Amino acid sequence: MEKNGAHSFLSDTPVTSLTMSVPVLRHPHVYHAFISYCADADTSHARTILDSVESRGFTCCFAERDFLPGECTSDVVVDAIHCSKNVILVISPASLQSEWSKFEMLMAVDDSHQRNNVCLVPVLLGGVKVDDLPPPLRPLTCIELMDDFRNTDDIIQAISKPEDTWESLLPVGNLAHGFAWGYYYGYLKIILPDLDKTVRQWRRVNNAEGRMSEKLFLFFPQSCRCRDSIADESSLIKHRGHLPIITKDRAGIIERQYKNTIYSVTDDNGEDYFFAGEYIGVIHTMFEMEQNATTGLQTREKYVQSMRFYLTLKRILDTDPECSKKCKIVFYKDVNNSSDAMPKLICNEIKNQLRKESSDDTTVCMTPFNSPFPSISSPDFARCSLKSPSSTNMVKSEPNIYREESGKTKSVERG
C-alpha cells in the first residue's frame, strides 16, 4: 500500500486470496455493502465488483438488480445506504460529473458521520486520483482497481475489517461538534430569534423593500479563511451599516453587545441589493490551525472537520424552528475565482430568497445538489463552485434531486 497524503492510501499491488469470516449483520443493517456507481458508464465494473464480493458470502444492495423499475428515488437510496454496513463508492471520471453519483456520495458521507463510523470504501477507476475526490473522501483509504480486477480482495478486506471512528482519522480530535454547539448557544441562539423583525424595520427605513431578504446570510468559505469584511471580496460589495445592537449580560461581561452588519451588492444590471451578512467566524480557527504546524491539523483533515461542523450545525438548527428559518448558510469556493463571482452568488441567493418570501414558499429549495451550499440542507463538496446552477445544468439522464429547507430529500425519480 503506497501512502498518498496524510491518511490516504492507494492500493498498487494485488492481494492474494484471503480467508475471512463474513461479519454478522445487526440492526439496522441488512446488507454488508451498498454499491454506488454511475449507471451510465460504470455498470459493468460495478457488477464485476458485486459478483466478486457476493461470491465470498457477502450480501450487497445493487440498484440495477435490487430496485424495482421507477423505484430509484432519493428516499430509496438514502434508506438503502442506512441499511448497509458499508458503502462501496465506485468512483470514475464519469461519476465525479454525475449529479446522481455525487448525491449518493454525499448521502453516504452524511450517514457515515451520523453513526461516526468510517464505513466508506472508495474504489477508483479510470485514472481517478485521491486529489480528484470530494474533500471529505480524501482522508480515507482508497483502492485503485486494476484493469484485470486482480485486487478485488482489497475491497473484501475493507468491508470485513473492524469499524473505525472518524476521530481515528483526525489527530487533533473532533473540533467540529464543539465549534458547532458553541456557535449555536454562544451566538446564533442570541441574535436569530428577532432578526427578521429588525431586518424588516431596517429595509423599510432605508427604502430597500423588495431588495433585501429577511434572513441572515452566513458565509462559509471552503478554505475556512474569513476576511475582515465581506466587502473585501469585491468592489461591488459595500458596507452600508448595521442592525440595532443587541445588549446582553453574558459570561461575566456586563452589557455585551452583538451587532450584525448590512452590506449592499450590485447586480449585472447595476441595481443594488442589500443583505445582513457575515462569515461563520468560528471556522476561521480551523484555517489558523491549518497554518500552524504544531496543531497537527492538515488540509484534508480540515475539510472533514468543516463538513462535520456543517452537518452538526444543520442538525442543531433543524431542532430549533425559531432559528433555522432565519439564516442561510452560503458555501463557496474562495480560491482561483474571478472578482465578480462572489457578487453574482450573493445576488442570486438574495433574489431566490425574495421569491420564496414573496410567495410564502418555505417548503422546497429548488436548487439542485451541484450548487455551493444553496441552503442549509445540501453542501456539495464534490465540485464546489460559485457558478449559479439551474435546471439546465442537469444531465438529461440524471435525476433532478432537491432537498426541502428542513433538510429532507424530495423524492424525484431518475429521468
Swiss-Prot record:
Tell me which Gene3D superfamilies the record gives. 1.20.5.5200, Stimulator of interferon genes protein (3.40.50.12100), Toll/interleukin-1 receptor homology (TIR) domain (3.40.50.10140)
Q: Which GO terms describe its cellular component?
A: autophagosome; endoplasmic reticulum membrane
Annotated region (Disordered), positions in chain:
387-415
Its GO biological process annotations read: activation of innate immune response; autophagosome assembly; innate immune response; positive regulation of macroautophagy; positive regulation of type I interferon production; reticulophagy; signal transduction
Task: Write down the top EC class of this protein.
Answer: hydrolase
- Reaction catalysed by this chain? NAD(+) + H2O = ADP-D-ribose + nicotinamide + H(+)
Q: Return the InterPro entries for the record.
A: STING, STING_C_chordates, STING_C_sf, STING_LBD, TIR_dom, Toll_tir_struct_dom_sf
Q: Which SMART domains match?
A: TIR
Residues the record marks as active site: 104
Residue numbers binding 2',3'-cGAMP? 256
CDD domains according to UniProt: STING_C_metazoan-like
The alphabetized UniProt keywords are: Autophagy, Hydrolase, Immunity, NAD, Nucleotide-binding
Any idea where the TIR domain is?
A: 29-163
Query: What domain of life?
Result: Eukaryota
Q: Where is the composition biased (Basic and acidic residues)?
A: 401-415
Q: What EC number(s) does its UniProt record assign?
A: 3.2.2.6
Comment text on domains: Homodimerizes by swapping the N-terminal TIR and C-terminal nucleotide-binding domains. Ligand binding induces lid closure and repositions the TIR domain. The TIR domain mediates NAD(+) hydrolase (NADase) activity. Self-association of TIR domains is required for NADase activity.
Family, per entry: In the N-terminal section; belongs to the Toll-like receptor family.
Its assembly, as annotated, is: Homodimer.
What is known about what this protein does? Sensor of cytosolic DNA from bacteria and viruses that promotes autophagy. Binds c-di-AMP, 2'3'-cGAMP, 3'3'-cGAMP and to a lesser extent c-di-GMP. Nucleotide binding has not been seen to stimulate NAD(+) hydrolase activity.
Q: What is this protein called?
A: Stimulator of interferon genes protein
Give the species this sequence originates from: Magallana gigas
